[in-house]
Amino acid sequence: MTIEFSHTTGLLLLAMPALLLMAAVIKPKQGAAYARAYRQRVQWTSFAAFGLALLAVVSFLFARQQNLMLGAGSLPAGLGLLALSIQVNGLTLVLASLVSFVLSVIARYSVQYLDGDPQQARFFRLLAVTGGFFLLVVISGNLGLFTLAIIATGFGLHRLLSFYADRPRAIMATHKKSIFSRTADALLLAATVLIGHQIGSLEFSQISAYVHAQDHLSIALHVAAWLIVLAAILKSAQFPFHGWLIQVMEAPTPVSALMHAGVVYSGAIIVLRTSELLAADGTALLLLALIGLMTLAIGSLVMLTQSAIKSSLAWSTAAQLGFMMLELGLGLFGLALLHLVGHSLYKAHAFLSSGSMTDHLRQAKVLKNRPISVVAWFTTVIVSGLFTLGIAAAMGLSIDQEPMLPAVLTIIALATAQLMLKALSHGTWREILVAAGAAIAMTGVYVFLHEVFITGFADTLAATPQRAPLLDLLLMAITIITFLFVAWLQGPGKTLMSPERQFALFVHLNNGLYLDRWVERLAFRFWPEKVGRAPKKSCAVIPPNPSGIEP
């Protein structure tokens, strides 16, 4: 094809994964000096990728751009073309900017974190490979290329999670993750074949155009939608397939940050990229919403019982992933994208600063909490709800435009109520007023961003899912009741229990309700794993550390 100025953004996006994958082509050699040079190459390449993302955004804003296709090969059985295709729109630009930024921060942090580690060159090579393929996931314009890139990203993450191969618990958790990930890959491949056979093309733009032109989907496309949702559930560590996400904490902290701030969102990205097809099906998203709601409720409660910082962060990620799946299942695709961006940045910061969390907790003042009465709790929630409703009405949000708006406003109201209740439990009147002002400001900012993402990505993401209004009403009611129950249990509901029931609930939640153990036994029965392998050969010779302190 002829390269034109309108392809500038596509070329910039394509250069991002290309640079990272090229940096990883050279196999690491032995020697400390070579290891340091290798890590510097990957670090500066990640910085360059982020710079290219910013240039791509500028190019997209100031000139009319179109999708890029540099090469294609015909697939058998009329499945269409497997093309090196780059889709240029707001979604791919936002995701590419986010991934490249997080990757550059992690690469910079890893230089100090792994300084002196004999395997640091191998780590940076795996980081470049995984990051490069993940960038290809978020920018690809062809479903076949998208699927292959997701599979490659999964294999790269597997190698990173098992980086220290002499840690049996890490190997076991990584193996369990690989079982679910490979199953999701198979489901996504099957969906790709069904879509290609039915439509005759694997280009995302043509898939969307085909779906819009049809009054009803064929059985093959309905099956493909369900397969995509099941793949997203497995990729996103949804309940009851969440255990590996909690148990991979023995991986290096940069790997935890990469996974929890990026790669674990593969499931959400799958749904966002195929939102037109899933919205046309409608019912598959219903399953996604229910599974996400269950994961959110369990994860948010279990998180409060964890004593280890990284374990608490892992359960928090599981809960937030459930929240994201709930938003996608409700058809709030723009809101889910906003959530993905915000939580990815927060989680990267949380994991990379987890080492200083202990010092922060030691220096923090221990505040004596005053018990919150049932009346005070209900009053705070109602007042917060009224403020949220008023701000939403003032900013022009309407239930006619968003049928799920009552559920969204309930969630916002409960979040701001938690801020107020925290101030009421141990704060002075001045702190309570400050908390009230912060809650109002946060609500306004959130509603504003909500409107920006909903309207800004209206041409890129699907509209409301096509399903019976009664199902939407029932799903909204279940969502509101679940959020109210979880908030109540975290507040006065807990204190109304007897000490024996509180202790029993704590034990059950602390163990994740035990379901993961049954899933683990079943999974390992079909695919057992041997642990305790010797560590791989060192790629760099580093002098011994005389202090005896591990880097």
Curated annotation (Swiss-Prot):
Keywords, comma-separated and alphabetical: Cell inner membrane, Cell membrane, Membrane, Transmembrane, Transmembrane helix, Transport
A family per Pfam: Proton_antipo_M
CC annotations in GO: plasma membrane
Protein name per the record: Probable inorganic carbon transporter subunit DabB2
Tagged with keyword Transmembrane helix: yes
Originating organism: Halothiobacillus neapolitanus (strain ATCC 23641 / c2) (Thiobacillus neapolitanus)
Example of a GO MF term: NADH dehydrogenase (ubiquinone) activity
Function as written in the Swiss-Prot or TrEMBL entry: Part of an energy-coupled inorganic carbon pump; its substrate may be carbon dioxide. Expression of both dabA2 and dabB2 (DAB2) restores growth in ambient air to E.coli deleted of its carbonic anhydrase genes (called CAfree, deletion of 'can' and 'cynT'); neither dabA2 or dabB2 alone is sufficient. Rescue is pH-independent, suggesting it transports CO(2) and not carbonate ions. Together the genes allow greater than normal uptake of inorganic carbon by E.coli. Uptake of carbon dioxide rather than bicarbonate has been suggested based on kinetic calculations.
GN (gene name): dabB2
Assigned protein family: Belongs to the inorganic carbon transporter (TC 9.A.2) DabB family.
Transmembrane segments: 6-26, 42-62, 65-85, 86-106, 132-152, 187-207, 217-237, 252-272, 284-304, 321-341, 374-394, 404-424, 434-454, 469-489
Annotated localization: Cell inner membrane
Keyword tRNA processing attached: no
Observed effect of gene inactivation: Required for growth in ambient air.
Membrane topology listed for this record: Multi-pass membrane protein
Record-linked InterPro entries: ND/Mrp_TM, NU5C-like, Proton_antipo_N, Transporter_DabB
Cysteine disulfide links: none
Domain of life: Bacteria
Record text on activity regulation: Uptake of inorganic carbon by cells in the presence of thiosulphate is fully inhibited by the uncouplers carbonyl cyanide m-chlorophenyl hydrazone (CCCP), carbonyl cyanide p-trifluoromethoxyphenyl hydrazone (FCCP), S13 or SF6847. Not inhibited by the ATPase inhibitor N,N-dicyclohexylcarbodiimide (DCCD). Inorganic carbon uptake is inhibited by the ionophore carbonyl cyanide m-chlorophenyl hydrazone (CCCP), suggesting uptake is coupled to a cation gradient.
Subunit structure: Forms a complex with DabA2, possibly a heterodimer.
Entry's Gene Ontology BP terms: ATP synthesis coupled electron transport; electron transport coupled proton transport
